[in-house]
Amino acid sequence: MDHAELTTEQVLKRDIPWESYMANKLISGTCLQLLRRYDHKPESQRGPLLDEDGPSYVRVFLNILRNISKEDTVEYVLALIDEMLAVNPKRAALFYDNSLSGEDIYDPFLRLLLKGNWFVQEKSCKILTQIISARPKMQNGIVPNGEASNSKSKLTSTQDVLRGLVDWLCSQLRNPTHPNCSVPTAMHCLATLLREQYVRALFVQADGVKLLIPLISPASTQQSIQLLYETCLCIWLLSFYDAAVDYLSTTRVMPRLVEVVKGSTKEKVVRVVIMSIRNLLAKGAFAAQMIDLGLPHIVQNLKAQAWTDEDLLDALNQLEIGLKDNLKKLSSFEKYKQQVLLGHLDWSPMHKDPSFWRENINNFEENDFQILRVLMTIIDTSADTTALAVACYDLSQFLQYHPSGRIVVADLKAKDRVMKLMNHENAEVRKNALLCVQRLFLGAKYASFLQT
């Protein structure tokens, strides 16, 4: 059978020759007794056994993984442990019982993670993630399993395991072993591991942050929605770590997050994206970009929807306040750009301020004269008379202050589009459309000369 398509249910139907292993002294008589009580029993019987003597079963499983290399048996024991933890994740604490303080509880899984087939790798990864995340925290200098907190071997072992785990997860994101399962498995484990600051540092060092960005895109199927959610959860966890934020500021993470939040109706996805954006805004590197992407307007639209999650509602309120505060701090040109991109033009002082136009005229060349193109869209489509009048006036100001203004505006085929507004019913619109056309025609001969 193809191990890449093997399921837990198929593996757990196997009959493992435990008696043969005992005869060959690979397991003890006590192990055999425990396995007979546990093997192929329903959870209603296994649960009480684990409640009564869970650490003994953990020791049996670890010994088998350490001493027996037969693939069918290794897969079977990993499936048993995975099922045990899936039924009750708190059972991961059994690995830290005092009676197991001398056991190397991580090594069997780390070894299999690097050597096994896909089924073995996936189970080892999930199990290792669960048990290392459940390790006891130090209290009064003593780790609850009885080892002193200054035990260098224990600390190094934990660090080595986390490093090995993070490296393996990054390798799966770069070059998946399984075409369909590697990436979801890696993201599921990272969404747990990145809760630790030390793991965040390891992930950044392993150049893992850039591997998340392509995974942030609108999703439709249940599986892809879960992958998107866990990816965005990882971004949220990384937003608490400055080195990760510094790296994120060099990527296209913000446009992708905004695209997701615009297109998603799944509340948990919207919540984790908004909470990520809120944290990134607080770090200060993304404010202008958020405003350029129209996030203030998006937040207003989201607030108008009937969300039930209190964390999401709080995050939306905080984000709205934060964006308003940052908008006040932005330069006059950034404020102007925000007005244009949102189509919210009014007669704020900068429009008629000669120094604004002199100081910022070259900024209008950004993104292939994006602002001029948006002004033309407003002229073509807006029903707001103030926006139309201001757009015509701003276009005339560009003609006046930019050395190649008339050529640029002519290339946009603006003349006929503005001339239509010279017959507009609103006097303010007519006046500013006329001003714009006059400035365009006054230099027509000069513009023609420059183009030859």
UniProtKB/Swiss-Prot annotation:
One Pfam family linked to the record: V-ATPase_H_C
Keywords associated with the record: Hydrogen ion transport, Ion transport, Transport
Cellular component, GO annotation: vacuolar proton-transporting V-type ATPase, V1 domain
Organism superkingdom: Eukaryota
Keyword Transport carried by entry: yes
GO MF: proton-transporting ATPase activity, rotational mechanism
Keyword Ion transport annotated: yes
Stated family: Belongs to the V-ATPase H subunit family.
Subunit structure: V-ATPase is a heteromultimeric enzyme composed of a peripheral catalytic V1 complex (components A to H) attached to an integral membrane V0 proton pore complex (components: a, c, c', c'' and d).
Protein's job: Subunit of the peripheral V1 complex of vacuolar ATPase. Subunit H activates the ATPase activity of the enzyme and couples ATPase activity to proton flow. Vacuolar ATPase is responsible for acidifying a variety of intracellular compartments in eukaryotic cells, thus providing most of the energy required for transport processes in the vacuolar system.
Protein name: Probable V-type proton ATPase subunit H
Organism per entry: Oryza sativa subsp. japonica (Rice)
